[in-house]
Structures are given as structure tokens and as C-alpha cells.
């Protein structure tokens, strides 16, 4: 289960107390869905994370996502799936940004050959219209 979640890729605001944890960002919708898929399938989880995190402000995040889409950007990812050949089924999870996949997911697809694999996708668009 490879997934891209804004919650995993956002810059924490200065007032977030990650040590005592009362204000840590809760799991995002996609992150939660990925966890459920993992529980049901017994598979592994792989969080797709960018090297340059997105803003924690939703409007600023949408602005950046729109710019990346306009430039057909492929944001750099923190790590790769080293043992992808070991899997014959891949689940992909992501939020619907600007009526499509986030550009980091496209980076993941460019960097990983899924030929011959059974691929299932799921997405969440609950934040799509909040602007």
C-alpha cells in the first residue's frame, strides 16, 4: 500500500508541540484509508514523502499544488521502494488535488515500474472544495 497524504507531507506550524503531542497533526484521510487497507490485506505500508514539505496552510498548499500541476513538476521523493519486485499487487492512495493526482504520486509512478502488477487506486476528495 503506497500512499501520498498531505498530513505526512506538511510542514508543522511553529506552535505545534510534537513532544507532548496535544497538537500533533492527526492522520489524514488517505493515511487512515491506507491503514485500513493494510489491516485488511496484511500488506506493507509505504508513505510517499517529498523532500520539500508542503505548507500546513491549506490555501498555500493548494497554490503550490496548482503551480506544480501547471509546470508538470515531479517533486523529489525522500525514498524509494527497494523491493517492489516482491509485490504482484499494489494499492495506491492519494488525495484528489486539482481534479487529479498530486504530482508526487506521478513522481512515484515514473520511478517505479508497475508493469504486470495488479494496481488498485483509492482517493479522497473531501478537502477539494474548501477554499
Language-model regions, residue ranges each:
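Active-site-proximal alpha-helix that buttresses catalytic centers in soluble enzyme cores
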Residues: 1-131
Amino acid at each position: 500500500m503506497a500512499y501520498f497524504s498531505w498530513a505526512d507531507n506538511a510542514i508543522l506550524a511553529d506552535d505545534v508541540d510534537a513532544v507532548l503531542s496535544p497538537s500533533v497533526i492527526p492522520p489524514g484521510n488517505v493515511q487512515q484509508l491506507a491503514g485500513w487497507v493494510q489491516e485488511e490485506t496484511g500488506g506493507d505500508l509505504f508513505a510517499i514523502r517529498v523532500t520539500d514539505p508542503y505548507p500546513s496552510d491549506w490555501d498555500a498548499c493548494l497554490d503550490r499544488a496548482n503551480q506544480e500541476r501547471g509546470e508538470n513538476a515531479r517533486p523529489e521523493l525522500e525514498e524509494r521502494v527497494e523491493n517492489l519486485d516482491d509485490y504482484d499487487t499494489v494499492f495506491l492512495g492519494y488525495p484528489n488535488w486539482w481534479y487529479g493526482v498530486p504530482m508526487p504520486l506521478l513522481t512515484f509512478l515514473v520511478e517505479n515500474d508497475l508493469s504486470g502488477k495488479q494496481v488498485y487506486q483509492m482517493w479522497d476528495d473531501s478537502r477539494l472544495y474548501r477554499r
